Amino acid sequence: LNLQEQLQIHLSEIARERDPFLATAGHFFVQEYIRQQFSQWGSVEIHTFKVNGKSCKNLILNLSADGKHQDLPPILMGAHYDAVPGTPGADDNATGVAVLLELARKFATAPAKYPLRLVAFDMEEYGLLGSAEYAALLHQQQQPLRLMISLEMLGYCNSIPGSQNYPSPLEKFYPNTGDFIALIGNLRTIRDLISLSRSIRKVGVPSQWLPVPNRGLIVRQTRLSDHAPFWDLGYPAIMVTDTAFLRNPHYHQPSDNIASLDLDFLTGVCQGLEQGIRRLS
């Protein structure tokens, strides 16, 4: 199977009602699917945390680096697997999880220079709870990270001029066509933003990058994913996103289905990220 077909299979398994409270069967199904996929490449660590007495789970796969680089700080890549009630959540965030699962395959079979830690986060839609718990745990363990990358909605693309919105005043600096993938990072990540963007453009997907100071507090929309708790604890972190509701009219709607996605775009994003992560110095 080629990459696009693999991504399509993941999407068809993950895109379903899976709110942790109102669609418990779907939520458990997706959790198990991720666990099974990860377990092909190594032992899966489960990070359990409680929310209102409910046990929630982040799923973690550690992949070692190529031979001589085992001691380097890991690159953490995360994607949330929960969804809001009433939507199959194809773009939000089956796309991010599908790419996470394929990057697991790529880097398990051909390791990167850095060790990788792949994390499927729970409870993002309830206030970034899974990533906040995990970031706090790493911080407490004094675990350094080379970079944290949050995969947040990677599959919606619209090449009609005027299809892309921005929080003001960003519209003055960025294109009004929603056909690019955005990389948003704290100031520590500027070199990585430039380099990852370049790798994504190389595979033919337009890419724009935005560095934000002060933990993104000025433009709050930059904080709406699992990278934000890492920013707050001083880690270098980047969100990769199709910009969600600033572009995708199906955001948090029943219509956020696989048919609304652009699979060529999603596949390109996945390829570009793989190449980009391999090129990080």
Regions found by a protein language model. Give the residues of each.
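Acidic/histidine-rich, surface-exposed loop or edge segments in extracytoplasmic proteins
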Residues: H10-P20, A79, Y174-D179, Q253-P254
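Glycine/charged-rich beta-loop-alpha catalytic/anionic-binding loops adjacent to active sites
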Residues: P73-P85
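Proline/glycine-enriched tight loop/beta-turn segments at coil->beta junctions
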Residues: D66-P74
